[in-house]
Curated annotation (Swiss-Prot):
Protein's recorded name: Serine/threonine-protein kinase WNK8
E.C. no: 2.7.11.1
Similarity comment: Belongs to the protein kinase superfamily. Ser/Thr protein kinase family. WNK subfamily.
Record's subunit section: Interacts with RGS1 and GB1, but not with GPA1. The association with RGS1 at the plasma membrane is triggered by induction of glucose. Binds to EDM2 in nucleus.
Superkingdom, natural source: Eukaryota
Membrane-crossing segments per the record: none
Keywords attached to this entry: ATP-binding, Kinase, Nucleotide-binding, Nucleus, Phosphoprotein, Serine/threonine-protein kinase, Transferase
Amino acid sequence: MASGSGFLGQISSMEEADFAEKDPSGRYIRYDDVLGRGAFKTVYKAFDEVDGIEVAWNLVSIEDVMQMPGQLERLYSEVHLLKALKHENIIKLFYSWVDEKNKTINMITELFTSGSLRVYRKKHRKVDPKAIKNWARQILKGLNYLHSQNPPVIHRDLKCDNIFVNGNTGEVKIGDLGLATVLQQPTARSVIGTPEFMAPELYEEEYNELVDIYSFGMCMLEMVTCEYPYNECRNQAQIYKKVTSNIKPQSLGKVDDPQVRQFIEKCLLPASSRPTALELSKDPFLARDGGKDSALLASSSTSSKYVRPPQLEHLPMDVDHNENKSVSSNEDYPWSQTIELQRIAENKEFRLRGERSDDVTASMVLRIADPSGKCRIVHFAFYLESDTATAIAEEMVEELHLTSQEVVVIADMIDDFIMQLLSDRTSSHHNQNSPRLTHEDHEAANQQTVNSKDEEAAGQSMKSDISADYYFPYSANDGNAAMEAGRDAESMSSYLDSCSMMSTIYNLSISDNDYPEDLKTELNLIESQFNQSFQDLLKLKEDAIENAKRKWITKKQKAVNIS
């Protein structure tokens, strides 16, 4: 007996040496195996010692989140929704906590080793129609559950990248609820999502849960054709123009089976005629005998190819809602730190922020704000081997109706960004005793004109990998200075709003008088836990601000002493 205990003790010691971290409850252990990375989040493989299952450990840096407006709100929205929503086709959140010492937010979620449905479909091109119908039924079950909440929950960013697969069982679950919203009014108003999957009414800022049905239709189109919707468009503005003009993606014409095409087109109908998730789940197409569909994927599985640029595979609950933006590991690209530039021109503020994604791509976000209260945010990719700053800027102006002076400003900012990016890369390589960039490399960067190998390659590179374009009013009473004022405070207050939003899900379901005692106790416990988490975060934020002020004062004093 004693020898057995000693043996188990040796195993325990070996296991403890293998893991990197343990959660406060002592139930979950994190390994150093990285499953995926986002702009401010890293997903690690972890293990649940109680149930004996592998899980995903989502680690978010608070300092990084604070630097990205709106992301804290999205993160807390996702945490609250996942805690409140329980369904077999919605990804599970097991546990979450704030680590004050390391200044991180941690979430333990289900692990899907097969990755997203998009990656899974790309890997397995020859898929029987039965499988696609099975995926569709599961997605619709998840959507019906979200939309049946009181008030309804709208995902707003449904796409194959945000649907995850268990390849061993064929199980499919909806994830990435960071952009989801609780519909407390008849229609929602904010414009947000991924352009290729956004319903026309989303741009009009008057929509309801049926926008998710439109996105589901685009998911079906991608599953059937193995092509990203609107891949014929070269930038987000062209997608916007087609969607708002009710022009369907060219890939829809590649769907040969009339019943499949009819089913997809039902999802893309105007909102007033669009069926609900429950109605679609009862559609005869999903009940058809799979044996009759042998030719459904014949053309797409053999000839179609994904035309999107290579991307990092986003694992479950990647809160970096770009969705399509690839963010590489700093270990692979040590020069990939974020660069931000600012210009004031024609009484407008231009902000360009981005980072290098890989050897040939940089991901950028351009924000243009004017005193009238209108703000435009455009996400795009710059392909270093073929794109030019002027060409990218002119494309934006052509579709977004900007002035010629704004073309110059945007092109100049992109030029400066690329120069700084290449300069940072040179420094990084030098520090690691790697070869420096040659003189010719710098000349190419200065000119920002690199001829593509052929016309087809140029066309391919110009298909910018764009995640979203937002148009929304902001408070601009004091001009440019007001644009940034109170942004952090708004993020924190929006967290409190999200708390109250989730409370209404329960409050509108049953009245206070109908609460059983055990439910009251559980709800009070949840309320106190999240209030404490908020206080912890607020304290961390205040500490970070004080540290920044102290560093600035110290730096200023040193400069005075030297002079």
